Amino acid sequence: MLIILKKIKMKKSFLISLCVCSLFIISCQQAPKVVDTNPNYEKNLATAKKFFELFNSEDLDAQIPLICPGVTHYPPFYGSEPGKYDEFIAAGKGWMDNFDEITYNAEVWLPGTDSLGVLNGSVRTYGNWSAKNTASGNVISNRAYHSFEFNGAGQIHELRDYFDGSGLMAAAMATNE
């Protein structure tokens, strides 16, 4: 009788060990790769890249068709409020008038999601800006994050800039005294 109980106990131990090992092996499998299924992402990504390319070449007129007339821009300055089309165009012109050798080097481009985590065709990017101030000659460099939302026509209808815009301007205007 004792031998039978030991065999039953060993079978239970073996089955439990087998279940634990199986669960471990299953849990170690790689998660499926997330693929952007939003058909607008590639087109919107090309628009965002073109927007930066035109900013780097200081071609505001060529940028304008990429921007929705109802755009909302969230600038990177302390205490700033969202601006609409005219403020956005003026801000871009201000950067271009006050800086030369403007470059944005994107480190990564990513698809964006809505508030529920669903891929929505929006575009995000992390990168580094550098430029030379025309008044002081100071060269500035700053890491940045930008997010773009697009309308049905593929134009930028919301742009959010995240970087230290106020500190950047202070560095650009600093004197060497």
Model-derived regions, located:
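Bacterial Sec-dependent N-terminal signal peptides
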Residues: 1-39
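Short, low-complexity N-terminal intrinsically disordered segments enriched in polar/charged residues
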Residues: 28-57, 61
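Hydrophobic pocket/interface hotspot
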Residues: 51, 62-64, 71, 88, ...
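Short beta-strand segments enriched in hydrophobic/aromatic residues
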Residues: 67, 75, 123, 127-131, ...
